[in-house]
Amino acid sequence: RELPPWQRPCPIRVVFEPQAHGATSFRFNGPNGEYGQPFDWQMEVYGTPERILDSVLPHEIAHTIFASHFQQRLPRWLDEGACSSVEHVSETRKQEHNLLVFLTTGRGIPFNQMFQMMDYPRDMLPLYSQGYSVVRFLLELDSKPHFVNFVRQGLQTHDWDGAVERYYGFNNLSDLQVTWNKWVGEGSPKLIVANESKSQYVPRLRQQH
């Protein structure tokens, strides 16, 4: 559906520096500040001109799209993971590399905790890498509209176990996490170019539990 118009444009502050990163802030106009139409946008983007254009801006703009579409706060893994998925491959490869480091050094986050996180944890970087990888895995399994419908049900019901069962066929978040771990262990392959179809790939991974 078409996104609602904003009350005012979003001002963007640009700072050129070697490290690519950004920040976008806004408020919701609902009674508790967690729901409603977003407003009072502020965006800051940092990095080289190339990285700002191909990674930082797409990431920060994606935050505004998700806020405008769902009109509520999102779990941190979902918001940052989905927004990281639109970055340049040079940035997403860093996430994939960092993920392996985090998972092999005891910094991975259990899904039953991660899916409920509405605020950033003290150790933020694993959330970004793991969130990106989980979003990419789900997008490999089905279409973007399917993913959006999955998110909508999870937000409405607060039952992510039920949402992941309905939309992706996993028994619960634990089942998803074990299967995702197997996928990561196989190198996070693109399923559209895998030697077996998507319908064969996930059942094979689950049989390895």
Predicted regions and their residues:
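Short, solvent-exposed loop/turn and secondary-structure capping segments
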Residues: 24-27, 95-98, 150, 193-195
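Post-HExxH zinc-binding segment in Zn-dependent metallohydrolases
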Residues: 69, 73-118, 167, 171-183
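Sec-exported extracytoplasmic/periplasmic mature domains
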Residues: 1-2, 62-71, 87-92, 104, ...
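Stable alpha-helical elements in mature extracytoplasmic
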Residues: 53, 57-61, 78-82, 95, ...
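Beta/coil-rich, acidic/histidine-enriched accessory regions frequently appended to metallopeptidases
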Residues: 109-112, 122-126, 156-209
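Juxtacatalytic substrate-recognition/specificity segment
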Residues: 1-75, 92, 108, 117, ...
